[in-house]
Structure formats: C-alpha cells, structure tokens
Amino acid sequence: MESIDTYFPYSEYRPGQRHMLEVAAQVARAGGIAMIDAPTGSGKSSVVASLLAERNKRKIVIAVRTVSQLTTFIRELELVRKKRPDLKSVYLVGKGSMCPLGGEGDVYRRCEGVKKFSNALMRDRADKGALTPAKDPFIIQQIRLMDKEHPLLCPYYIASKMFVPAESMGVKMVPSTALRTKADRVIASPVPPRELAEFCAGICPYELMMQAARNTDIVILNYHHLFDREIREQLYANLGVEPQDVLLLIDEAHNCGDVITGIESVELEQRDLEQAARELTGMRKRHKGADAVHHVLPRLTEFMKGLENSQEAEDWFDPAIFNRMIIKESLYKNMDEIVDDLIGISEVIRENSQKNGQFRETAIERLTEFLFRLAQSATDTAFLTVYQKNETGITLEVRNIDPAASLSDVCGSHACCILISGTLSPVESFRRYYFGSAAVTTLALPNAFPKENRLVTCSNDITTAYSMRQNKENTTRITDYIRAFSLLKGNRAIYFPSYQILETYAGLAVPHLRNRKVFIEPRDAGEAGSALTQFLSLPSRGESGVMFAVSGGKWSEGLDYRGEMLNGAMVVGLPLAPFNRVRRMLIEYYRHKFGDEGEFICYTLPAINRSLQALGRVLRTPEDRGVLVLAEKRFLEKRVRGALPGWMQDEMIECDITKFRDVIGSWK
C-alpha cells in the first residue's frame, strides 16, 4: 500500500479534504461502497489519489456524465503525473463524438455493421496474402466505390488492423503498427478530446483509445459505458478486466438515478406502428410469423387512438387491458408468443438492413423491445406503464422508476465504488434511494469557500404552490423579488419550476428591466447554446444581464460559470414535478418501500437537488462572490430546510420582500 500523499498533487489540503481522501482509501482497501457529498471547492476530484494509493495493480475506472467533467479529471491526472510520471491514463467518450465515419443511423449500429463487413473482407484478403489491409489495392478500391451515406466498410477501422502469422497455421488479426504507435503516444502525452480526431489522422479514434486503455492504470469513461449493461460487459471484455478487479469512481453521482431509469425505459409512438406495418409487408415470405404480427398492429393502433380522448397530458394505462386488447382476435394465446415472433423478425430485418448499409433502429425492433419490457413490468413493480399525449399524438412508455437494483448491481460487482457529488444532500436520503438498506459509508463535507463571499436568503412570503398561483398579492410579490434581484450589478440567473411559470413571470418582470439585457431559455435545445454563450460573454465586454431559466433545464446543470460570468442566482419556487396519477403511483411505490420517507425521497428530494444545482452555478472558485436566493417559503419547512446542506441552513437569512431589499442592497 502506498501513501495518499504520493498521488496528491497539491501543496496543502483544503478543509476536510484529507479526511475525505482517508475515507475513500479505507473503502478502497476494504471493499464496499462510499457516498461523499462534497460541495464545490472541496477538491473531490482528488479522491483519485486514494484509489491510486490502494489499487495494488488493479485498474481504476472513473465514470463522468459530461465532457466538462471529463476535462476536470484529465487536468487532475496531469497534475498527478508531475509527481508520478509513470502513471498512465486514458479516456473513452461515446462513439457518437469520436466516430469520423459518415452515414445515417445509429452510430453504434453503424460501427457494428461496418466492422462486421470490414473484418470479413480483411480476412478474405489476408488469406490471399494482403496482411496490411490499409495498403491493399483491392480494399482501397472497395472503399472508394462504396456509398458514403450507406457505408459497408470503415477505412478508419481497417487502418487500425493488420495480420501476422498465427502460432499454429494461417494468420491472425492484431492492432496495426500505426495504431500501437499512436496509442503509446496518447498514453505518454494525453490528447484533449477536441484534438483527438486530428491526432488519429485516418485511424479509428475509438480503437486507438481502446488499445491505449488496455495498458493504462486509469480509464475515464462516460455514464453510458458503465450503466448500459451490454456496453459495459463488452467494454470490460475488450479491456481484459473483470468488475471485481476494478476500483470504480462515479462523479456527479446525483445524476445516476435519472441516467439509469432513462436507459431502462422504452417508448413507442404511433408513427412507429405505421413504420412497423411497412417493414412487415416485405417479410411475409421470409418469416412465418410476419402475417400474424401484422394483424396485431391495428389493435395496437386502436388502443393508442382510444387514449387520444383523455384529458390528461400524462397518465397510467393498465397493462392487463392492453394485453387483452392486443391478443383479442389474434392468432396468439399470450404476449410472450408475440414477442417471440417479433424477436425472430427483428433479427432478419436487422441483418438485411446491415447488408444494405442501413443502420437506423427499425420500428419492429422498437416494438419488440417495448412489448418485451411491458411483459417484464407485469412482475416488476419498479416499472410503470405510462402514456403521454402531445402534438404528435400518443406515446406509450414502459418507465423504470427505481434505479436501485441496477445501481446496486453495478457498484456491488466492483472491488469498491466511490460516488461523489457536490449535491448529494442529504447524503443519507440518497443512500436509501440508491442502495436501500445496504451497508454504505457516507460522508458530508462543509463548504470550503470563504463565508464572507456569499449571501444566502430565503423568502417567507411567496410560493409557486398551485393553490397560490392565481393569488394576485403573491404574484406581485414574486415579481417584486425578481425586479429587486435583477437590479443588482453583474450577471444574474433566475430559475423557475417550469417553462410555463418562467414565461408568466418573464412577461410580468421584463418590461420593468429596461436597462438590463434579458436572456430567456428557449424550449428549443438548438437555440439554447448560442443564447447562453452571448449571456456569459457580457462581462468580458463590461456589460451584464439577467437570465431567465428552468430549474433542471438546459442552463442549470453541468455548466461552469466562473468569475464574473455569474454573480447571483435565484430559485423561484420549489421545482416539484407536476402532480398527476403517475406521480401518485410513484409515491405509493416508494412509500411501500421506505414508509413515510418514501414521498420525500422520490418527490421532494429531486426538487431540492434541482434547486441546489441551479444555485451551484455561482460559486465555482474560492475567489468568486455571489448572492444565492431561495424565493419560496416551502424551503423554510422543517423537512425541506433540513435537507439543505448544513452551511446553507446555518447562513440562510429569512426575509420578506422589505427585508430582502435591505439585505441585498447592503451586499457589496
């Protein structure tokens, strides 16, 4: 065992940081799971020093959600390498951002398909003596002739491979000399993600980084590499490791639940059924079940059209009624028989699509996955059957509502797992949500930033609770808070529970902010990036503005607003999810699981976390100064206030509108 200090790259520890690293080291040494709530400025990325000290030649995997978090760890490990030049690390981002091959469809399917055809061609040519595929005139000609929109071969993958004599007879495929050389270079001198494509210069970036990853101490990867079981198992097989030999670190762990439930949920739209019918038309002679499945589709369409009469935008549908309606007058006895036929048909369609360079997910595949998950939901209460009604029609969904089983499986299968975040508050509630009654080490650190650099207030006279939304006095006071806050110098952000509430108060407040540049978060994600860039660039020109955004939206999480980019944030309202029958069923599930605390864990805790994430955009370095405002009296309720970080509870100034004006007026 080595000392933490051996891998700690800084001259001194921040308050609480040494203790955090010792806790992480103990868990890494003994095995198990730890959850660490470490506010911005705690130096939580240095937890990697604990894992390095305890690794005993085992591989370390760091899972991150965004490229900015990836960059944080790349930077941290570069500092560690100054003390330990022998340390080797590499990153693996998703193929979507690494793949240089053009074409339509899903990048993972495209990769699978072109690798299959490329391997077959390369092996055939190798048997005829062409051991360096990238230099084989025949392969070069085939690449030149193929349809670039529907590729069957990947020149980047082909350049990554070569053949050598096998030990017994024939030849075997190995990484090309160029690939191995570049992999060694990227280990010796890490290449930033934005420069990777240029560095690879004709070689597959993913193959290159995978080759490098096999020979490194640390691999940084994105959430989907870890939480998608199929991708994780394939990845670990390629790395030549078993989970029990890997030390796992999960960053921004407050996001784990949403990512896992998203991966394990599946949707079906009305247009999927229309496309499925077209796909089945050409299958009747190729699969005996095609006709029988085709006769089921009108029943599915009828079921979805029946839901169009609903007055609810989202509601539960009964899977038993769904099953009876689909099977009625069909050739099937139960849903399992339909799924079996669909699986067979899907395999034929997918194989045929790949041969034609078509790599989109087919509607039949989506229908198969939906009905398979729906059948599973009958015996698993962690799944709800839900429909949503919008402008495009009805969408059916089998929704996972509990990430605990999958997360426990992932974390428990590794030698150890450390989950860190700046917003795992209260950490005991997150522990129960993620791991139930399992033994988990928890730690919550204080805020390491100077107290004098921040002002925290909470309003006691306003709310966005549904019962008060039509109250004119309440609405006027909320508008007054927004106006008072917006008059402060510097860039300000105001977050609302929903777009509807945002638009209401933007309409009321913006006309009074004549001397301020105002930016309103667009619903369209494509427009959000450029508008945000304009807002953040104001201070560099000696200007400032006010940003109206949604809690949990595009402008509230995973963004680093350092220095003068953001001087204050206000959260208007407690951003609870809309209450409907689906939400009530979710609450009932968690009450059954956790008793009275269940509603808090599944309903209130996510709202608190969205609020903390929004406020957390302001103070990113010890030198940053800012005002943090909770403009909602429900934050003063005992259960909600008690869930806020300790430093926030201690420093919070309770205000009405008059006191609020005085308090922020004296802030300098």
Please report, for each region that a protein language model flagged, where it lies by residue.
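A substrate-engagement module of RecA-like helicase motors
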Residues: 1-7, 40, 58-217, 227, ...
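Walker A/P-loop NTP-binding motif
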Residues: 23-27, 45-58, 75-80
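A contiguous, basic/glycine-rich beta-loop/short-helix subdomain that forms a polymer-engagement track
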Residues: 193-214, 227-238, 340-463, 473-474, ...
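Conserved interdomain hinge at the start of the Helicase C-terminal
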Residues: 409, 463-497
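Conserved RecA-like P-loop NTPase helicase motor core
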Residues: 461-473, 522-635
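Conserved helicase motor "Helicase C" RecA-like lobe of SF1/SF2 P-loop NTPases
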Residues: 497-522
